[in-house]
Structure formats: structure tokens, C-alpha cells
């Protein structure tokens, strides 16, 4: 099953406020906000990706969860076919630098250069800096436990990519 952190607030005031902002942003963009959550590579540990998918759904994002052991080609194809606004990758195998490079190359090939991509995993600070330099919009690690805060971050990354002003933290 999927473990939800003890500090989860999926039905509290903060989550309700985030849900309203997700809905408002969808209206501004003319369609509901969609996130693709994927686990590229051979890593089979899916708890973090599933927690993000569940929390995203709880605050109003449409979630496309493609599962584990995906190729970068499968991720890019799904992003194109599903019309997602942002991709969230979960990489715990240590291959995050190589995987991101390949995912970006595949996104470019299908015409999705510039689509925001975030990544989560056990990522050293030095690698997080490199990932951001290479175009990753945000890096999350196990110490990032504020799920509502992550959802606001994701919402604002989508807003920024679509030339909308950021929302205030809920």
C-alpha cells in the first residue's frame, strides 16, 4: 500500500486552498492540470512516486502514473499523448544524472522542450545543483516532507512555464 505521512493534510484547510488554486490555474489555462509521475530505469521502489501521485490527486491535479521501470522514450511518449503540464520523476538508483539527460533528449525529440520536470530521490546536494543547471525545475529528497509545500511548488512551476504569476503559499 501507499503510506501517507503523518503530517498529511489532504482534507485540511491548506489542502483545500491548494485545490482551489489548482482549479483556478486549470481554468486560466483552459483545461485541468495534469502531472505525469514516472520511475525511469530499473529501480522498483515506488513509495515516494506513489505518495506524490496520491497527494497530487487529492489537491486537484489529474495524475498520469505510468508505473515503474520506464524508459525515457516511454516517459516522453506518455507526456506527449497525455498532454501533461509537468513531469515528476522518481530515481533512487543513483543514475539520476544520466537518466535526466536521456529524458530531456527524448522530450526534445517529441517537441516538448521546456516542459517542467522535477525529480525526487536520494540525491546528493552536489548532484542536485548539477540537475538544476541541466534544466530540472526542482529536486526533492526524503527530507522534503511538506507534501502541501511540494504541491504549491509544482503548481507554481506550471504557472511559471505558462507565464502566469505564482500563487502565494497556501
What are the roles of these predicted feature ranges?
Residues 1-170:
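Domain-level signal for soluble alpha/beta catalytic cores
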Amino acid at each position: 500500500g501507499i503510506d501517507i505521512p503523518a503530517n498529511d493534510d489532504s482534507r485540511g484547510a491548506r489542502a483545500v486552498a491548494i485545490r482551489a488554486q489548482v482549479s483556478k490555474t486549470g481554468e486560466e489555462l483552459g483545461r485541468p492540470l495534469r502531472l505525469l509521475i514516472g520511475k525511469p530505469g530499473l529501480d522498483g521502489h515506488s513509495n515516494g512516486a506513489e505518495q506524490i501521485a496520491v497527494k497530487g490527486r487529492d489537491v486537484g491535479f489529474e495524475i498520469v502514473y505510468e508505473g515503474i521501470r520506464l524508459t525515457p522514450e516511454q516517459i516522453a511518449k506518455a507526456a506527449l499523448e497525455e498532454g501533461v503540464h509537468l513531469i515528476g520523476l522518481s530515481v533512487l538508483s543513483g543514475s539520476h544524472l544520466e537518466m535526466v539527460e536521456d529524458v530531456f533528449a527524448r522530450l526534445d525529440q517529441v517537441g516538448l522542450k521546456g516542459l517542467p520536470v522535477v525529480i525526487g530521490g536520494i540525491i546528493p546536494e552536489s548532484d542536485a545543483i548539477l540537475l538544476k543547471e541541466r534544466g530540472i525545475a526542482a529536486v526533492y529528497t526524503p527530507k522534503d516532507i511538506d507534501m502541501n509545500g511540494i504541491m504549491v511548488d509544482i503548481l507554481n512551476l506550471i504557472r511559471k512555464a505558462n507565464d502566469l504569476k505564482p500563487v502565494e503559499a497556501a
